[in-house]
Amino acid sequence: MRPDEWPARRAAMVALGLMLGYFAVDNHVPLYPWNNLAAAGPQWPSTLSGWVPGLLTIWALARRSRWGITVGAGWTVVWVLLQLRQWWLPYLLGPTPLHRDFTWYWEGGYSETLRILPGRGARPVPDLEHVALQLLSLTAALLTVRAAVRMWSRATAAA
């Protein structure tokens, strides 16, 4: 292990672990009004959609797998982009070809959770529960991409 790449990988592993831990607690521990699990329905598919690739990314970081870290970094970026698509596009732009119907927001009970952003008509408002997840996810994505870049730059420098 090269000492100069370990801090980047360790930071990414910690960020991913914190994000996954928060995601699991948030999906399965009722903390109303932070989350509203009563209206959300089963959360295991959602949890596993984050945990499986997240744990594989942590494993790749621990094993120093350049390709695994790169794929994991790609997943973290897609993970953040999907959250932006789900919450921020409807909030900022209203109905778009991607979001014509906002019943998921009202039926999922998200309108009853804590928010700090002002409402914008009948548009979904990103609640604190999801803003926290998005900040953790963005941090994990940035640190995992940084770890991937460091792994590849070290490999090309050694070649």
Features from the language model and the residues they span:
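Hydrophobic alpha-helical transmembrane segments
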Residues: P53-G54, S111-A140
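Interfacial segments of alpha-helical transmembrane regions
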Residues: D4-G17, A60-W79
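Cytosolic juxtamembrane helix at the C-terminal end of the final transmembrane segment
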Residues: L93-P97, T139-A159
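Transmembrane alpha-helical insertion/packing segments
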Residues: M1-G50
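Hydrophobic alpha-helical membrane-insertion segments
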Residues: M19, T70-T96
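Physicochemical signature of membrane-embedded alpha-helices that form the seven-helix bundle of GPCRs
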Residues: P45-S49, V71-G74, V78-L81, V125-L136
